[in-house]
Amino acid sequence: MVARNEIFWADLGPPAGRRPVCVITRDAAATVLTAVTCAPITRTIRGIRSEVPLGPDEGLPEQCVIKCDNIVTVPVEALDRGPVGQLGEIKRSELDRALRYALDILY
């Protein structure tokens, strides 16, 4: 089962390849869909508002960021069998803010 705010390794195909992603599909939908919306995670850190910094506390081997400007829909079968980590409460709030910024959602 896949849940929002979990981090999985996924095969995104070319050019992104295999990389970690953070699931952003809501839980009620993620349990029944064959594909979920994810934000890719990258080691390229630009320090912009649409990024969420991550690291070992979230199950990743080094410092990196969730890149909310490049969200993608990924077939569930492209995700590894289990998550490598998940976001804590503070990172979940940061992700929500970064997504609102990236998608220009004002409220």
Regions found by a protein language model. Name each.
Residues 10, 22-23, 71:
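Short hydrophobic/aromatic-rich motifs at helix boundaries and adjacent loops
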Residues 16-56:
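Compact nucleic-acid interaction/catalytic patches
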Residues 10, 27, 84:
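Generic anion/oxyanion-binding catalytic loop in active/binding sites
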